UniProtKB/Swiss-Prot annotation:
Keywords linked to the UniProt accession: ATP synthesis, Hydrogen ion transport, Ion transport, Transport
Function (record text): Produces ATP from ADP in the presence of a proton gradient across the membrane.
PANTHER family (UniProt xref): V-TYPE ATP SYNTHASE SUBUNIT D
Protein's name in the database: V-type ATP synthase subunit D
GO BP, sorted A to Z: proton motive force-driven plasma membrane ATP synthesis
Annotated organism of origin: Chlamydia trachomatis serovar L2 (strain ATCC VR-902B / DSM 19102 / 434/Bu)
Taxonomic lineage: Bacteria, Pseudomonadati, Chlamydiota, Chlamydiia, Chlamydiales
Highest taxon listed in the record's lineage: Bacteria
Gene3D superfamilies per UniProt: 1.10.287.3240
């Protein structure tokens, strides 16, 4: 309200149109906010589950910690930390593009089954499980952050519409309407006075 308001019929029509557009757009924003809130809750659960899975895989891998330092098997273990294939796509959720992890393939180290202890398979499997689960957990966290950021942005816009734009526009309309109504009454009064003077002059 600090800026100058043009108290004209054109301004009234423009503000009326603006208010109608705000009123039409607000439900769409509120719907998007509700959808994002649901998606964020789902993403929170997925991120928590992925993190828990990764932590469990880490604990299983740490059970073999003493074996990691055996020089004979170090190369095989290190190869399990290398990613051969990482297939990612983009998924649109409530208008937000988030990363979709489709497939993770790690390097399969070559070693002689006859010349290695039976526990090596379990060791390498635990390493692979940890690496893959960590990648999925990081992807889930990235999705969550993107959805939370969009929810924050949409929430700000909803608040802007509800608490500033719509009330301010409504107040402006009311002010213009009162001014135009008062001016109309004044104009009518002036016209009556003018007619009366003309009539008196004729007499």
């Amino acid at each position: 309200m600090s800026s100058q308001i043009k108290l004209t019929k054109n301004s009234y029509r423009a503000e009326k149109q603006k208010l109608n557009m705000l009123g039409m757009y607000l439900p769409t924003l509120k719907l998007k906010k509700a959808l994002l809130q649901a998606e964020v809750q789902s993403a929170i659960r997925l991120a928590a589950e992925s993190t828990a899975t990764n932590e469990q895989a880490r604990d299983r891998m740490y059970a073999f910690a003493e074996l990691f330092s055996i020089p004979l098997y170090t190369d095989a273990v290190e190869q399990c930390f290398s990613v051969d294939i990482l297939e990612k796509d983009v998924e649109n959720i409530a208008g937000v593009e988030v990363p979709l992890l489709k497939r993770v393939v790690l390097t399969s180290p070559e070693y002689s089954l006859l010349d290695t202890p039976i526990w090596l398979d379990s060791l390498l499997a635990s390493v692979k499980e940890y690496v893959v689960s960590k990648i999925y957990a990081e992807n889930a966290q990235e999705r969550l952050l993107l959805l939370e950021e969009e929810l924050r942005r949409v929430s700000i816009r909803v608040n802007l519409f509800e608490k500033k734009l719509i009330p301010t526009t409504s107040q402006t309309l009311k002010k213009i309407a009162i001014f135009l109504s008062d001016r109309s009454i004044t104009d009518v009064g002036q016209m009556k006075m003018a007619k009366k003077k003309i009539q008196q002059h004729k007499e």
